[in-house]
Design a protein with these regions (language model features):
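Extended Gly/Ser/Thr-rich low-complexity repeat segments
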Residues: 103-120, 149-169
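A surface-exposed beta-strand-loop module
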Residues: 135-154
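Intrinsic disorder/low-structure terminal segments
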Residues: 51, 60, 72-76, 136, ...
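Mature N-terminal, pre-catalytic/accessory segment of carbohydrate-active enzymes
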Residues: 150, 157-224
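Short, surface-exposed loop motifs enriched in S/T, G, D/E and P with embedded aromatic residues
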Residues: 84, 131-136
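Sequence-level detector for tyrosine residue identity
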Residues: 2, 58-61, 137, 153, ...
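Catalytic core of carbohydrate-active enzymes
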Residues: 1-128
């Protein structure tokens, strides 16, 4: 259950497998994740930062207590979204930092994942000067920067946002692909899924024509 505003909430049922958990991220979320495997207290040498379309800010705090010494370091992320006259989305991100640079590991790398941009163009400036972006092939626009304390990084990703139906269709393909077995019903549903043109066709197909298991239909319909 999550709340919208201060008064009325909305209940959502999110169906997932036992091996995964449902996670909701609001527009503009900036989510830093450590690449370290297992639990630990040292500040990470490599970070993955997930950026979701929208406007948002996040300041990450790190200290040197794991090394039993003083020192603080702050990394600030500011995300902004604009739309061009042609309907393209420009998701920008500015990264600044301050404090004791000795707190973080030397040679830190930050992997930036623009979650809602499945493909697009990247513009990178370091210290106000254009720089080449190290683009990584992944399921969304991803680049890696060699982070230096005190430097300013400006990234702009221009992309055309997927329609709600196209995004749902890709998710439906993953759900059907992950179903147990290869029975004829699943195979037929996967094939006919490719022929759907809009949400109305999809709703009619899965509610009235499909012989898919009820739990699968519920998962397919939950994002409508």
């Amino acid at each position: 259950v999550y709340e919208i505003g201060n008064a009325n909430g909305e209940e959502k049922t999110l169906l997932r497998t036992l091996e995964s958990i449902p996670v909701l991220a609001k527009c503009g979320t900036i989510l830093p994740l450590s690449e370290a495997k297992g639990n630990g207290t040292p500040n990470p040498g490599t970070l993955t930062v997930k950026i979701f379309d929208g406007n948002g800010e996040y300041e990450m705090y790190e200290d040197a207590r794991a090394e039993n010494r003083d020192g603080e370091f702050f990394t600030k992320f500011i995300a902004r979204e604009t739309t061009t006259e042609s309907g393209e989305t420009i998701q920008s991100l500015c990264i600044t930092s301050s404090g004791d640079g000795g707190v973080i590991p030397s040679g830190r790398k930050i992997r930036l994942q623009f979650v809602n941009a499945k493909k697009g163009n990247i513009a990178l400036k370091i210290g106000g000067k254009e720089a080449a972006a190290e683009k990584i092939y992944a399921d969304c626009v991803t680049l890696c920067i060699d982070f230096k304390p005190g430097e300013t990084y400006e990234i702009a990703v221009t992309h055309r946002r997927e329609s709600k139906f196209d995004a749902w269709k890709k998710r439906a393909e993953k759900i059907l692909t992950g179903c147990d077995g290869t029975n004829a019903v699943i195979i037929t549903a996967n094939r006919e899924l490719q022929e759907l043109k809009n949400e109305n066709e999809a709703a009619l197909f899965f509610v009235y024509r499909s012989k898919l298991p009820e739990a699968v239909v519920e998962r397919l319909m939950e994002t409508f």
